[in-house]
Amino acid sequence: MKPLFGLETEYGLVAAGPTPSAEDNLLAAGTLLSAIRRVVPALNADRGAGIFLANGARAYVDAHHLEYATPEVTDPWEAVRYTLAGDRLIERAIEQWIHSSDEERPRAFKGNVDYVGRQTWGSHESFLHRRHPREVSAQLMPHLVSRIVYTGAGGFDPYAPGVTFAVSPRALFMEYPESSSSMENRGIVHTKDEPLASGACRRLHLICGESLCSEKSMWLKSATTVLVIAMIDGGLEPAAGLALADPVGAFHGFARDPACTVEVRLSSGAAATALEMQRRTLALAEAHADAPFMPDWTRAACREWRATLDELARDPRSTATSLDWGIKRALFERVLARHGSNWELAAAWTDALKAVWAAMRPERPPAEPPDPETLLEPVEAAQARMAGAEAICRRRGLTWSELPRFVALRRALFECDMRFGELGERGLFTDLDGAGVLSHRVAGIGDVSSAVTHPPATTRARVRGKAVRELAANPLDYTCDWNCVVSARANTWLDLNEPFETEARWQPFRIGRAASLQALTQPGAPSADWGPSSRRELARWCYLNGNYGGATRLLEALLAEDFEVASTHGHLARLYLTTGDREKVRHHVAQAWDARADAPAYVVARTLWLQILVATLDSKDPQPWINTLKTHLARSNEPSAWSMEPVLDNLTDTLELPALAMMLSLYRAIAGDDPVSDLDEYDWWTGEGRGVGATT
């Protein structure tokens, strides 16, 4: 199968002015989104925020960041070209904004971490595949963990109180191998399944990557990951012999290892470095380079992959002009030298500050040390001196009175990191590249300026982009999505469910407005639609509007396609709880439990809550299911798994009071909280919103 994938870049924005607030920055993101419309033709997104562009891409504001999602591409050269087109588009939009108003220029950054607020953003990746998501996740994990030797953005450890270089700062924010959340409790693999296509197409979504500036780093990130996914789809097992005993621990270990020599433990009991893991994966790709399931550019990718690993093995510092983290490390060392410091001295200060914090609060050291700048405040400084800060520093060859100089150095390094990825002429990477001191370019990237306004030719982005260009003059009559363009006035829609569709096929309108939704759910209604995700949302709409028959037909059709089997059976169980059909509730809960092996942790937890409820309603002992739930929650350690909401939400009128009271009591006993207040903002159908103890 031909590869198909895309990338998202999250841009940090700082509004004009001496002290812009978060609200100012959010307003700037919205204004910049409007300015993009004046740079390239655009249509409003049909379901959700943002706009789709004439190059097939999407731009939108999410969590105070302006995001640009590339159109679907088929090779790493296109991936780099359209990622750079996003940068170019933002730069042009800023110029457009300045020319049309008296406001000062806002600043846009391709960054990944806010060290002061300990927040992260970066770059998401989406890949088309056909294997089961759980299989892909397991087989891809060793590659994702070890690829940061060439995909790391470089920066600093956000949890260190001083200054500690990190190959990949964002990696240190990943807490789980898998997670359904992208805002809190992040996982290396994002488990939310949103295909955005029809048939057997599945979409792998990764949130562990970083925004990059080096063409070589960007190219390698996409090329190598596509090859590993192709091998998995082809029936190979890239993780054979490389499964990690602790994927998150290994990810963090490699992220803190600029020498590329740290060994991590494998499930087999053996140990391996990131470079050794990468070489074994590369060898498998080389051995199957001519297989029909591999892209036709596999050999070219393997040559560049091997050359990069060889370079890192000889001396990681040799990447000081080619890879993001190598370039940054060399740049930071120049800043250190200008301040009369070096990595060893910075490490001594970091160690001293850790000891100072521990001495100041021996009864309960903070999980995350406060910013060392707070030690410059008089009260904190006095406490530190009383705790023996001077002695702590002397033992490390430091002088406590020099702390202000170290804090100033830290600020300078953080500013350097931020400015590295700034768009426009103020960016340090742009400055270095313009000076000709870097060697990061990749041959064959092509015309970036053309990619700002024109889509790729070999995917459905071609049809989408062409439609946007032709229809943008009538923005109130048309809306767009990844898998459709909708004409409300003409009652037609452009079907883009086929990822490689390159010809426009307008069809009669069947989904999208209330009348059409009702019509689609009637017996004999046409089955064509916008894909299984849309049918799931349509079923939700029917359920919330009391159309239980329509919801049932849609959900049963999803089961016939094996779409999210455990989750869909759970939806049907909840529907029949509402209608009072106990026998069907039992059936679908049992079916959901049988399909649990392929389900995310939060779906398994929901199924267990339903098992407990069924046992309670049937006057049976629910304790075995309660014990299973407790064990599952302890193992999954995923806050979204705590939601009892499918059992409670909108069911208070259909549950007998004793059963409801028992469930509430049980929930408080397990979760230690009041579930009702946490369920108000939780969307049971999609699993998004607030769960106990977490926000998303």
Task: List PLM regions with ranges.
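Terminal catalytic/cofactor-binding subdomain
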Residues: 1-110, 138-156, 172, 179-188, ...
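Hydrophobic/aromatic packing residues within the alpha-helices of TPR/SEL1-like helical repeat arrays
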Residues: 516-517, 555, 589
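Start-of-helix register in tetratricopeptide repeats
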Residues: 533, 567, 604-606
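Residue at a conserved register position within TPR or TPR-like alpha-solenoid repeats
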Residues: 542, 576, 613-616, 651
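"A position-specific structural signal for the A-helix of alpha-solenoid helical repeats
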Residues: 537, 571, 608-610, 646, ...
